[in-house]
A protein has these predicted regions:
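Alpha-helical membrane-protein topology signature
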Residues: 1-256
């Protein structure tokens, strides 16, 4: 269903779209920085694949407004850079899969998602991608929680990414609701996104505090040594049993 946009002043659109784009740009930039620091992807693997396919089809395949296509293309190029990091570090989230199989999975999901998006666009006559984009946002928000739970640590993540992503999604929701008022599905979906984003912020904050670190430390080191067995934290204090073992070894050496 192609939705007609509501009659609204252009300045209102840009007041909402500006913080939306800025929030997402900051989130992507900080996620890239965090991934380089921790050697783990800052954006969930499946989100990178599906989102890249979405931007690719909107930029280069599907019909778009002249003003919208360059914007979509810019985001597609950013996604390509994140894809590089995904191929370099993303396999670490799938220890039972070889790196070759992981690469096949990545490009397979991208191809499938692109075909799905094209077919959905024509089936629903969703020329602007508003339905698929809103649905993708729900999936994206959930994926951050799944990533945190899967790793069991804050590795590759930061409160600044979580907050920037939340701000971007908040203003994205209001942009859609202003452009297409009265559509209850959009209201439901964005209320879902905002709730999930807030939940992720709380869970991540608690996890970083649990690791004995400040959630707001800008240059906090990796929470664990990448690829290290057992995922011990870098610079973390030894556990109680380990400390007793070390003290016993010192006493034994001294008495010998």
């Amino acid at each position: 269903v192609t939705l007609p946009e509501a009659d609204r002043p252009s300045w209102l659109f840009w007041i909402l779209m500006g913080p939306c784009a800025s929030g997402w740009l900051v989130a992507y930039g900080l996620a890239i920085y965090r991934a380089k620091l921790d050697k783990r992807v800052g954006i969930p693997v499946f989100v990178v694949e599906v989102n890249l396919a979405w931007e690719f089809t909107l930029s280069l395949i599907l019909d778009q407004a002249d003003v919208q296509r360059p914007i979509n293309l810019s985001w597609f190029l950013v996604d390509c850079f994140i894809l590089r990091q995904t191929l370099a570090y993303g396999w670490k989230d799938y220890p039972g899969m070889s790196r070759r199989a992981f690469r096949w999975m990545v490009f397979g999901v991208i191809a499938w998602s692109a075909v799905f998006h094209i077919m959905t666009t024509y089936e629903l006559k969703d020329a602007t991608g508003i339905y698929t984009g809103t649905g993708l946002n729900v999936f994206l928000s959930l994926s951050f929680i799944f990533m945190l739970n899967r790793r069991g640590s804050s590795l590759g993540q930061s409160m600044y990414v979580a907050l920037a992503k939340g701000i971007g999604s908040f203003f994205a929701g209001w942009t859609v609701l202003v452009m297409y008022p009265g559509h209850h599905l959009f209201i439901f979906l964005f209320l879902t996104v905002w709730t999930i984003d807030a939940t992720y912020c709380v869970l991540l904050y608690r996890k970083v505090r649990e690791e004995g670190r400040s959630p707001w430390a800008w240059n906090r080191g990796p929470t664990e040594v990448p690829d290290a067995p057992g995922g011990l934290a870098t610079g973390s204090a030894p556990r109680h049993g380990e400390r007793e073992h070390e003290e016993a070894a010192v006493r034994s050496a001294a008495s010998g």
